[in-house]
Amino acid sequence: MSIQNPRTNFIEVFFRMIFGNMQILLLGCPVFKANGCSLPNNTERFFIMAEYFNPGESRSLFNFTTSLQNLLEKKNYHSRDIILVCIGSDRATGDCLGPIVGHKLARFCNTHKNSLHLFGTLEQPIHAKNLEATLQFIHSCYKNALIIAIDASLGVVEHVGYITLGEGSLCPGVGVDKNLPEVGDIFITGIVNLSGFGSQMLLQTTHLNLVMQLADFISLGLFRCLMHSQFRSSLKCAE
């Protein structure tokens, strides 16, 4: 469970006038590190952009897929294994977004095992107890892998029900005060509830319908983008 920090609102209002639907996450200050992403390894970068998508808007899925494809191109995905790490537990409604996304994509990933690998499903979730071991396994087996991290997050009231996408790592568990390894080169989160006190209780009282809507959006967007990516990779191999 990642967190979208409500204290970034005054920053967001200013930068949205410039960047539209892009939220700027300033880095280097602990206040902002809790906002669903971690400090990048390259300390010369001063901010991360996280784009917000409202599943209820007609072009959101197209825009999400396009933005994700652009990030994959930027990360030179053609020559790398793509790893999906769907984080969360099936024991709390608000934290099961990742495993549900993994469950929905499992069959597709199984048919593209040569370059696409999935960790985290309802049957085999990736959570606080096995995340570190899973990451060690990934880094030992897949050299120069491109990791896409998917997790639920908490946020301000106007962002509940939104999807975020950006370049950088997630800090899983920050929303519920857990210290876990950073994950991902690209992050995707679904904002399932409000951030604040009593986060553990919020996970138990989150509406499953909202989680399913977010999971449907993320899994369909990933499916369309990765299908397109696999097709383009096949063309490059044919050349």
Predicted segments, located by residue:
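Aromatic (phenylalanine/tyrosine) cluster motif
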Residues: 10, 14-15, 19, 32, ...
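Extreme N-terminal basic, low-complexity initiation segments
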Residues: 2-10
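N-terminal catalytic or cofactor-binding beta/alpha core of small enzyme domains
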Residues: 18, 28, 41-147, 152-239
